[in-house]
Regions:
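Short linear motifs in intrinsically disordered
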Residues: 1-5, 27, 71-78, 100-111, ...
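Acidic surface patches and DE-rich sequence motifs
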Residues: 14-16, 28-30, 36, 45, ...
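Short beta-strand-centered aromatic/proline hotspots
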Residues: 18-33, 91-110, 175-187
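Intrinsically disordered, low-complexity, charged/polar segments
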Residues: 40-78, 114-164, 188-245
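Intrinsic-disorder/low-complexity loop/linker signature
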Residues: 20, 25-26, 31, 47-48, ...
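Extended, solvent-exposed polar beta/coil surface segments
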Residues: 1-68
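Short coil-to-beta transition motif at edge beta-strands of beta-rich domains
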Residues: 3-21, 76-95, 163-170
Length: 245
């Protein structure tokens, strides 16, 4: 897959090769701190300074740490300051809950500055609300593809892959819908969405203009069998999660 091509709803396997580094602080307050082996310090940043250390959440069931993707070898509990260890991401199934593009790139205290933020949740975790004012948010773990960390991605599923945000379609039950994401369907009749659009679907317009014959054929072919509810079931089987609202 194009390693910068992400959409909400994508199911991915993400990994990062384990790389040698040094422990700066053993497990403290559910985190282990290591010298980060990939980013460079942006010494010209006017808004703050980074010491080159990253605190990784230790997966012990607390909300602060359950989103963490990175792991250490040996395990965090076996590490103390000064130890040499490896840090990386074993192949992990995640689903994408948010995608943000930054032009110009974000002003960060490390280099390279990220041009994209992708938020993911590990298999078994669903989006959830946290109390207002909490330092946590339930969308998941943020990564910045292309920021120097050698992530690799394998796309396992992209629901409604032939669709684009803003597409307008007609379904087999005679209802018209707007597609804004695999779980974001708006019926033009203003009636409750119910079980969602009834397949097969006919593409009516794309980007506010009449669709091309090729685009219409792709949408029709992708929805000739199956259903919206089957798509949800297939997605949930991969993610062990509920679709992001």
């Amino acid at each position: 897959m194009d390693e910068l091509d992400f959409r909400v709803g994508d199911v991915l396997s993400v990994a990062c090769p384990f790389t040698d580094t040094r422990v700066e602080q053993g497990v403290t307050w559910d985190h282990v701190s290591v010298r980060w082996p990939w980013w460079e310090i942006d010494s010209s940043n006017e808004f703050g300074q980074w010491n080159g250390i990253v605190a990784l959440g230790v997966d012990n069931g607390v909300p602060e740490a359950e989103f963490e993707l990175f792991r250490t070898d040996p395990l965090p509990e076996q590490l103390k300051a000064g130890d040499v260890c490896r840090v990386g991401v074993p192949p992990t199934v995640v689903h994408v809950t948010a995608v943000d593009h930054h032009d110009p790139p974000l002003e960060t205290v490390w280099l390279p500055h990220p041009a994209q933020t992708v938020t993911v949740l590990r298999r078994g975790l669903s989006y959830r609300e946290f109390p207002e004012g909490s330092h946590l948010h339930g969308s998941g773990y943020t990564i910045h593809p292309g920021d120097g960390i050698p992530f690799t991605f394998e796309r396992l599923m992209r629901p409604y892959a032939t669709f684009q945000a803003g597409d307008e379609v007609a379904d087999a039950a005679g209802r018209a819908w707007r597609f804004d994401g695999p779980w974001e369907w708006t019926a033009f009749d203003e009636e409750p969405a119910g079980a969602g659009p009834t397949w097969p679907l006919i593409l009516l317009s794309r980007a506010g203009a009449p669709c091309s014959a090729g685009d219409a054929e792709a949408v029709a072919a992708s929805t000739v069998s199956g259903s919206h509810q089957q798509t949800i079931r297939d997605w949930m089987a991969l993610t062990e999660a509920s679709p992001t609202p």
